[in-house]
Regions:
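Polar-ligand-bearing catalytic/cofactor-coordination segments
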Residues: 1-125, 139-182
Length: 182
């Protein structure tokens, strides 16, 4: 779908790799994604883990920003890694998944719950209807939980911004890059 090419050798690559090393972020490569073929949207991210970690920059990002601004964007992305945001979000998703499975198991066995909804008396025959009810109810729960997810997301973004500010010895490159992103 998207093509990834290694970032050309030169000053930009040297600056970005130096920043990553300074932050203690080991990346195998820096790659450029051909995002301009589908959109004018700009982005940067890291993918992989251990010795297979890669930094990916959209070609649009490289075209729109000065090297110092690109460093600030990369510092922000590294901030997500250093602050442990990915494992925290994965753990939260796993927790919600476990709660969902627990509810399915518990409510499938509940004669009171199933009886009030007119479901079968045999526990094996209740799984489908209970799953259907919980699937519909999940939409209601996620509607009410969405503000908390947004709050957590904003908290993580502010933490990554603070990390980038500290890495860049001030807020100006980050502010400038964020203005160009939006």
């Amino acid at each position: 779908f998207n093509k990834l090419e290694p970032l050309d050798e030169g000053e930009l690559k040297d600056r970005l790799m130096t920043l990553a090393d300074k932050a203690g972020f080991r990346a195998k490569t820096i790659e450029v994604m051909d995002g301009s073929k589908r959109s004018g949207h700009s982005n940067a991210f890291f993918t992989g883990f251990g010795g297979f970690r890669r930094i990916v920059l959209y070609d649009t990002l490289i075209e729109q920003m000065e090297p110092e601004e690109l460093e600030a964007v990369l510092a922000h992305e590294i901030g997500h890694y250093k602050c442990g945001h990915v494992p925290k979000r994965l753990a939260l998703s796993a927790l919600f998944g476990l709660v969902g499975f627990w509810l399915i198991a518990h409510l499938t066995q509940s004669s009171w719950f199933c009886g009030h909804l007119g479901f079968a008396t045999d526990a094996q025959d209740r799984l489908g209807p209970v799953f259907l009810v919980l699937s519909v109810a999940a939409g209601v729960f996620t509607f009410w939980l969405a503000p908390f997810g947004s709050l957590l997301s904003r908290k993580h973004e502010f933490e990554a911004d603070a990390f980038a500010r500290d890495m860049m010895c001030g807020p100006d490159p980050l502010i400038s890059s964020l203005r160009k992103l939006h």
